[in-house]
Amino acid sequence: MAPVEHVVADAGAFLRHAALQDIGKNIYTIREVVTEIRDKATRRRLAVLPYELRFKEPLPEYVRLVTEFSKKTGDYPSLSATDIQVLALTYQLEAEFVGVSHLKQEPQKVKVSSSIQHPETPLHISGFHLPYKPKPPQETEKGHSACEPENLEFSSFMFWRNPLPNIDHELQELLIDRGEDVPSEEEEEEENGFEDRKDDSDDDGGGWITPSNIKQIQQELEQCDVPEDVRVGCLTTDFAMQNVLLQMGLHVLAVNGMLIREARSYILRCHGCFKTTSDMSRVFCSHCGNKTLKKVSVTVSDDGTLHMHFSRNPKVLNPRGLRYSLPTPKGGKYAINPHLTEDQRFPQLRLSQKARQKTNVFAPDYIAGVSPFVENDISSRSATLQVRDSTLGAGRRRLNPNASRKKFVKKR
């Protein structure tokens, strides 16, 4: 594998311990990337790198260009200042050594495709290689294919229904009672032997991961190719950065040094106003403010095309259990109300002063009391409500009474 001439490394490259000396000839990064790494083992590896790490700051004009492009793609809220500088440095190196004539100034439109599977159904199973084997369509007596549904309107339910029971044994018993011809045991053994041989032929070498096909399987799972004639690339594991790079026309490298042709991830799409966001931590829509965000799988190809895969499964947008009565709003310092809007204000729920005090005998203003130990607060309002520092502004934990809850929980 020919190394890339210029590689811009993100923090994910150092955290994943990527062999950058084998991936690129010249390794670039910014000082903010090294500063934000807090892992002790990673910082220990950074002290003894087997290659020269070059620090270079991007020009303000490229930072401004990348910022405007990320706002158009919708990834700007998910990018930090360090991420934008890494993207700008990649764009700057591409402009210096290759040119900007092939780069895009506007993101392409989103293409929509539907699927009968659930959006969270795994596309690949880790540890198993399941190659696709095309099967010829079986013709029925009417001349129609048996694998195609007669009505496409109900095709989405075929994936979720339970398999039909096998009634061959009961039919054979009815034929024996009526005295009709039943196939002999020898014929059944011949048919079973033919099926066994067919199954054995399917199992030979199919579905197993071997040293001969491990490279092919890794490329299929990661949608990666060998980087050929690539002079500038960015090695990152962040999907928002990969999305911006691919839509701009820049090259994205994986941790193993392969060239990423397609990036797969999930985004949140509001089914009320149809706006999307890549910030998976959001609960309410940033455009309309409703709690109508749903997870949608997306793929970004190497030409910058963004595909959103919607599901025709009716269970994805099931309105069951969404209508329920809300409790009466309560006031006060320790009120716990349901979280209904994003800008809703909650009480601070702080601990009492007695619970927050600490004993420091070496403090200059320390006053010796009856006991040198900290008193345990058990009588204040916050202590009786079991308020902790981790629950600041958490609101009502279980908003929907129709939601499932754990049983057999140990009581305090």
UniProtKB/Swiss-Prot annotation:
<comment type="similarity">
    <text>Belongs to the NOB1 family.</text>
</comment>
<feature type="region of interest" description="Disordered">
    <location>
        <begin position="180"/>
        <end position="208"/>
    </location>
</feature>
<keyword id="KW-0863">Zinc-finger</keyword>
<feature type="compositionally biased region" description="Acidic residues">
    <location>
        <begin position="182"/>
        <end position="193"/>
    </location>
</feature>
<dbReference type="InterPro" id="IPR039907">
    <property type="entry name" value="NOB1"/>
</dbReference>
<feature type="modified residue" description="Phosphoserine">
    <location>
        <position position="352"/>
    </location>
</feature>
<keyword id="KW-0597">Phosphoprotein</keyword>
<dbReference type="InterPro" id="IPR033461">
    <property type="entry name" value="WRNPLPNID"/>
</dbReference>
<dbReference type="InterPro" id="IPR017117">
    <property type="entry name" value="Nob1_euk"/>
</dbReference>
<comment type="subunit">
    <text>Interacts with UPF2. Component of the small ribosomal subunit, ribosomal RNA processing complex (SSU RRP complex).</text>
</comment>
<keyword id="KW-0255">Endonuclease</keyword>
<dbReference type="GO" id="GO:0030490">
    <property type="term" value="P:maturation of SSU-rRNA"/>
</dbReference>
<dbReference type="InterPro" id="IPR033411">
    <property type="entry name" value="Ribonuclease_PIN"/>
</dbReference>
<feature type="binding site">
    <location>
        <position position="273"/>
    </location>
    <ligand>
        <name>Zn(2+)</name>
    </ligand>
</feature>
<keyword id="KW-0378">Hydrolase</keyword>
<dbReference type="GO" id="GO:0004521">
    <property type="term" value="F:RNA endonuclease activity"/>
</dbReference>
<feature type="binding site">
    <location>
        <position position="285"/>
    </location>
    <ligand>
        <name>Zn(2+)</name>
    </ligand>
</feature>
<feature type="modified residue" description="Phosphoserine">
    <location>
        <position position="325"/>
    </location>
</feature>
<feature type="zinc finger region" description="NOB1">
    <location>
        <begin position="260"/>
        <end position="332"/>
    </location>
</feature>
<feature type="modified residue" description="Phosphoserine">
    <location>
        <position position="201"/>
    </location>
</feature>
<dbReference type="GO" id="GO:0005654">
    <property type="term" value="C:nucleoplasm"/>
</dbReference>
<dbReference type="Pfam" id="PF17146">
    <property type="entry name" value="PIN_6"/>
</dbReference>
<dbReference type="InterPro" id="IPR014881">
    <property type="entry name" value="NOB1_Zn-bd"/>
</dbReference>
<dbReference type="GO" id="GO:0005829">
    <property type="term" value="C:cytosol"/>
</dbReference>
<keyword id="KW-0862">Zinc</keyword>
<keyword id="KW-0540">Nuclease</keyword>
<dbReference type="Pfam" id="PF08772">
    <property type="entry name" value="Zn_ribbon_NOB1"/>
</dbReference>
<dbReference type="GO" id="GO:0008270">
    <property type="term" value="F:zinc ion binding"/>
</dbReference>
<dbReference type="Pfam" id="PF15017">
    <property type="entry name" value="WRNPLPNID"/>
</dbReference>
<dbReference type="GO" id="GO:0006364">
    <property type="term" value="P:rRNA processing"/>
</dbReference>
<feature type="modified residue" description="Phosphoserine">
    <location>
        <position position="184"/>
    </location>
</feature>
<feature type="binding site">
    <location>
        <position position="270"/>
    </location>
    <ligand>
        <name>Zn(2+)</name>
    </ligand>
</feature>
<feature type="domain" description="PINc">
    <location>
        <begin position="5"/>
        <end position="108"/>
    </location>
</feature>
<keyword id="KW-0479">Metal-binding</keyword>
<dbReference type="InterPro" id="IPR036283">
    <property type="entry name" value="NOB1_Zf-like_sf"/>
</dbReference>
<feature type="binding site">
    <location>
        <position position="288"/>
    </location>
    <ligand>
        <name>Zn(2+)</name>
    </ligand>
</feature>
<dbReference type="GO" id="GO:0007601">
    <property type="term" value="P:visual perception"/>
</dbReference>
<keyword id="KW-0539">Nucleus</keyword>
<comment type="function">
    <text>May play a role in mRNA degradation. Endonuclease required for processing of 20S pre-rRNA precursor and biogenesis of 40S ribosomal subunits.</text>
</comment>
<dbReference type="InterPro" id="IPR002716">
    <property type="entry name" value="PIN_dom"/>
</dbReference>
<dbReference type="GO" id="GO:0030688">
    <property type="term" value="C:preribosome, small subunit precursor"/>
</dbReference>
<protein>
    <recommendedName>
        <fullName>RNA-binding protein NOB1</fullName>
        <ecNumber>3.1.-.-</ecNumber>
    </recommendedName>
</protein>
